[in-house]
Regions:
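Short, small-residue-biased leader/transition segments that mark boundaries at the very start
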Residues: 1-7
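AMP-binding/adenylate-forming catalytic core of the ANL superfamily
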Residues: 5, 20, 25-26, 33-36, ...
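Phosphate-recognition beta-domain surfaces
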Residues: 13
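Glycine-rich active-site loop/lid that clamps phosphate-bearing ligands
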Residues: 16
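Acidic/polar alpha-helix N-cap and adjacent early helical turns
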Residues: 163-176
Length: 176
């Protein structure tokens, strides 16, 4: 199966899947939910993206549902977030897909600045230029004070899309 192939390939990102005696057989009295996460070969699909290194260890690199698909290109938000953390003055950053008429989704960066730091969108784009692929450079850059959070303190990535659309509307930015 495609799931088992991920385990064999080093350096190739894919969905983290597992099976074995310690893996659940399914959700109690819920065959529909079970069918969504367990394939015909009994692999449990975690929804996490990961990569196998040269030592045979796996590293989680993100979540499948967070992946941005821009004009056929798969963009992993965590990769861009890790890059933007290197920009002086950035305290925290989250990247999410913003709906796009032309590309399906465009990259949106939500940045919390360190106290007292002033930054413009152009500063972020200049930092990215010639260092990451053009299609990964954020089309939309929003400076925010906080991210939408759950009661337990986790960032609600799925709400960033709506926040991005709202901020575009408030700022008069046309969605292309």
């Amino acid at each position: 199966s495609a799931a088992s192939d991920v385990y064999k390939r080093q350096g190739v990102q894919g969905e983290m899947c597992n099976r074995g005696y310690n893996t659940m057989k399914g959700y109690y009295k819920n065959p529909e939910a079970t069918a969504e996460v367990i394939d015909k070969d009994n692999f449990l699909h975690s929804g996490d993206l990961g990569i196998k290194d040269e030592d045979g260890n796996y590293r989680i690199t993100g979540r499948i549902k967070d992946m941005i698909i821009r004009g056929g290109e798969n963009i992993y938000p965590r990769e861009i977030e890790e890059f933007l953390y290197k920009l002086d003055g950035v305290k925290d950053v989250q990247v999410a897909g913003i709906p796009s008429k032309k590309y399906g989704e465009a990259v949106g960066a939500f940045i919390i600045l360190q106290e007292g730091v002033k930054m413009q969108e152009a500063d972020v784009r200049d930092f990215c230029r010639n260092k990451i692929s053009r299609y990964k450079i954020p089309k939309y850059i929003f400076f925010v004070n906080e991210f939408p959070m759950t009661g337990s303190g986790k960032i609600q990535k799925f709400r960033l899309k709506d926040l991005g659309l709202q901020l575009c509307k408030e700022q008069g930015i046309e969605i292309i």
